[in-house]
């Protein structure tokens, strides 16, 4: 029984505590919304609306003013008082523990206050836009009208230079005037925002007119005067050159000029109605195209002048080159009496003769083409440049062949001197072997030395042949020289190894009595030494000594100096 009573008591206390906490939370939220409502009431919205009274109260301005004032009156007189009543209802619901209804009503009140905030923000922003539009219009209209008057005067002053576009300028200026009149009308009616839009349109149009007044006169000069004059000059120059014998059909300049003239007429029509976008680039293209054609004609004239001078000189150069080849052949026949020339040299000279013959035929073709005016002079000049490269190549080949003949005797004397030096080298190496007192030389080295002497003998014998085949002599001398010098290097190395082997064996004798194995290895090293196997002798002696003394080879080398 007491447990039941105690449980009921606990539940009752818990309920009252929970209710007290919830009511406190609702009261706190009611106070917050009450402060928000009062903040809205205290805002200077009437002052913001009152700014509009300084404007012309008609049309759009008057309509907006009445709407804003009505909205504010509705907020102050109807909506916010209703919010006040709803806040009292929330407190009543909370006191009666009707928490769900209290929460729902609070959410509704908060949503209404948010809606009022959004409505007031839009209202204030619109008022600022309206007032600022009036101020901006009043500030800018003066400079816009000044620009209008300035452009009207410029259009009158430059009327002659505006050519056929003058009427279109008049229409654009009239359009600008109509826009400014519309601006005045909207301003007088209090439609300041509409007036601002019209003023921006007028400013943009006047800016276009100002830009066009700057560029159009110059464009007319280009299209009506400069370009036609240049095309006429180009046409006259083309006619004069054709009459002077220039072949210009390849360049198709006539058709290019027709296309440029068609483009000029098209641009002139566009300029008349002031459609100028990209026109300067189009005019630049026409002028660059004409400049390229003028340069093309100038290059043709230059090419003709160069050809007039170049052709006789090239004919003379070809004749001199043919004479040089004839002299080369005669000298070759003379040299063949003493020297045997390689077959390739004779074939090479025959090939040179064919090449010069082909160059002679090509030059005749170029002469005919030039005289009959079948090609442009610039293309003929290119042919001549290529032809001259071929002639230069032949001249270089003839000079090389001539130098080869001149160097034959020089090569012979050089070969004799080299053979003499090789003989002395062999004698020097033999004396070195005798002085070295080594037991002998390995069989492989003896064979190499014998091969070197044979190569030397072959070269000496070949140098005595008549007729002399100098190419073969040079090859044999080079072979003998390479082999003898290589043998000399191997010989010096072998002598040094023999001396080192002898020193190592002598050094090792101090350890001969240490063991039978040491004695045996040193004896084997001596046998290898006497058999001229010096590398093996060194290795065997070192193996015998190293158990007693490390790095013996380096020590012996140091002692031997």
UniProtKB/Swiss-Prot annotation:
Pfam families (UniProt xref): EzrA
Membrane topology (UniProt): Single-pass membrane protein
Source species, domain of life: Bacteria
Coiled coil: 98-130, 166-214, 251-465
A Gene Ontology cellular-component term: septin ring
Extracellular topology ranges: 1-3
Principal cellular location given in the protein's record: membrane
Transmembrane segments: 4-22
Keyword field: Cell cycle, Cell division, Cell membrane, Coiled coil, Membrane, Septation, Transmembrane, Transmembrane helix
Stretches in topological domain Cytoplasmic: 23-561
Subcellular location as annotated: Cell membrane
Biological processes annotated in GO: division septum assembly; septin ring assembly
Family according to the record: Belongs to the EzrA family.
NCBIfam families: PRK04778.1-7
Function field: Negative regulator of FtsZ ring formation; modulates the frequency and position of FtsZ ring formation. Inhibits FtsZ ring formation at polar sites. Interacts either with FtsZ or with one of its binding partners to promote depolymerization.
Protein name (Swiss-Prot/TrEMBL): Septation ring formation regulator EzrA
Organism: Halalkalibacterium halodurans (strain ATCC BAA-125 / DSM 18197 / FERM 7344 / JCM 9153 / C-125) (Bacillus halodurans)
Source species taxonomy: Bacteria, Bacillati, Bacillota, Bacilli, Bacillales
Encoding gene, per UniProt annotation: ezrA
């Amino acid at each position: 029984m007491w447990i039941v009573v105690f449980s009921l008591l606990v539940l009752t206390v818990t309920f009252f505590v929970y209710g007290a906490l919830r009511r406190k939370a609702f009261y706190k939220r009611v106070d917050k919304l009450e402060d928000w409502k009062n903040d809205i009431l205290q805002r200077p919205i009437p002052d913001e609306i009152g700014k509009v009274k300084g404007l012309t109260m008609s049309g759009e301005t008057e309509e907006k003013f009445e709407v804003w004032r009505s909205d504010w009156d509705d907020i102050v007189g109807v909506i916010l008082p209703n919010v006040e009543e709803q806040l009292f209802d929330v407190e009543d619901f909370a006191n009666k523990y009707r928490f769900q209804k209290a929460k729902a009503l609070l959410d509704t009140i908060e949503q209404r206050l948010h809606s009022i905030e959004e409505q007031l923000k839009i209202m204030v922003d619109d008022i600022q836009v309206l007032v600022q539009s009036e101020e901006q219009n009043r500030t800018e209209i003066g400079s816009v009208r000044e620009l209008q008057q300035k452009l009207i005067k410029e259009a009158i002053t430059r009327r002659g230079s505006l050519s056929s576009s003058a009427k279109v300028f008049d229409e654009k200026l009239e359009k600008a005037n109509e826009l400014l009149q519309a601006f005045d009308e909207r301003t007088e009616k209090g439609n300041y925002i509409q007036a601002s839009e019209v003023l921006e349109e007028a400013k943009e149009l006047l800016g276009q007119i100002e830009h066009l007044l700057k560029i159009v006169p110059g464009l007319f000069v280009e299209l009506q005067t400069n370009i036609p004059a240049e095309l006429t000059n180009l046409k006259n120059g083309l006619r004069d050159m054709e009459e002077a014998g220039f072949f210009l059909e390849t360049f198709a300049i006539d058709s290019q000029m027709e296309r440029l003239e068609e483009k000029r007429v098209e641009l002139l029509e566009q300029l008349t109605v002031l459609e100028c976008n990209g026109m300067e680039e189009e005019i630049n293209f026409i002028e660059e195209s004409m400049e390229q054609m003028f340069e093309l004609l100038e290059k043709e004239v230059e090419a003709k002048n160069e050809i007039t001078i170049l052709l006789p000189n090239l004919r003379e150069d070809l004749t001199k080159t043919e004479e040089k080849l004839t002299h080369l052949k005669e000298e070759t026949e003379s040299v063949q009496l003493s020297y045997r020339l390689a077959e390739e040299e004779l074939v090479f000279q025959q090939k040179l003769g064919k090449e010069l013959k082909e160059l002679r035929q090509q030059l005749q073709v170029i002469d005919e083409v030039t005289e009959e005016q079948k090609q442009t002079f610039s293309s003929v000049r290119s042919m001549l440049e290529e032809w001259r490269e071929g002639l230069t190549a032949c001249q270089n080949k003839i000079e090389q062949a001539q130098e080869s003949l001149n160097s034959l005797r020089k090569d012979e004397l050089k070969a004799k001197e080299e053979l003499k030096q090789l003989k002395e080298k062999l004698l020097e190496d033999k004396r070195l072997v005798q002085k070295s007192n080594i037991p002998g030389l390995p069989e492989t080295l003896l064979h190499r030395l014998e091969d070197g002497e044979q190569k030397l003998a072959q070269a000496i014998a070949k140098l005595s042949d008549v007729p002399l085949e100098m190419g073969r002599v040079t090859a044999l001398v080079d072979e003998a020289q390479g082999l003898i010098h290589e043998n000399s290097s191997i010989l010096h190395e072998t002598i040094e190894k023999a001396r080192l082997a002898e020193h190592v064996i002598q050094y090792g004798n101090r350890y001969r009595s240490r063991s039978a194995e040491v004695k045996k290895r040193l004896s084997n090293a001596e046998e290898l030494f006497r058999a001229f196997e010096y590398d093996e002798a060194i290795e065997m002696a070192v193996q015998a000594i190293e158990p007693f003394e490390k790095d013996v080879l380096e020590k012996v080398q140091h002692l031997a100096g």
